[in-house]
């Protein structure tokens, strides 16, 4: 709970701490014995702490994002085991590696820098929810499916963005195929789609280390790609802001509310 409190911002710990305790209470005093949970906690804490510190050192995670990621990793392993940790670690590591290998020098305004707590939760919240539902319902097979599907969606979306930005050229509107500026949500490219497919196959393949091959493998791939496409569709609704200066070499719109310390004017879309 201390880790959760430290990773909460703007007083949100007043809500997050009791919510997290409420979620953990049934496990600490219910189906999973306290000894079992404590044993798993001690097993995984050094590993995820090392991973978090290395990620912080490489600037993949902010300080608060590191605490959140460590908390997430400990919780996933304590309640589910390695099958609920390895895929999401693969997602974070592959995303960071691709971001560095495929970075471009183009003037594209996108959200960069170390992942903060909200980004960690955005990517890890759905997998955690799948695990919690599985433990509550005592149906871990469906929990594993939901977990791998949600991680595949996040990986698919991340790989799609990285491959699309590096190799895709001008993206197309996902619905009417009109040209869009690079870096704005809602655009698709063929390399980006191939990246999405690759990300899904990557996570589904990791699942093979824990489960025998079956129809679930193809289902995870489809779910992952579908999640990436859905994200692009929702991206069309995301707020876009007018940049104060633009030209043929620089975009005119961004999804950032602020640019060089100046609050930008929203021209379309919805604020999330």
Residue ranges and their predicted role:
Residues 1-28, 36-272:
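Interhelical loop and helix-boundary elements at the membrane-water interface
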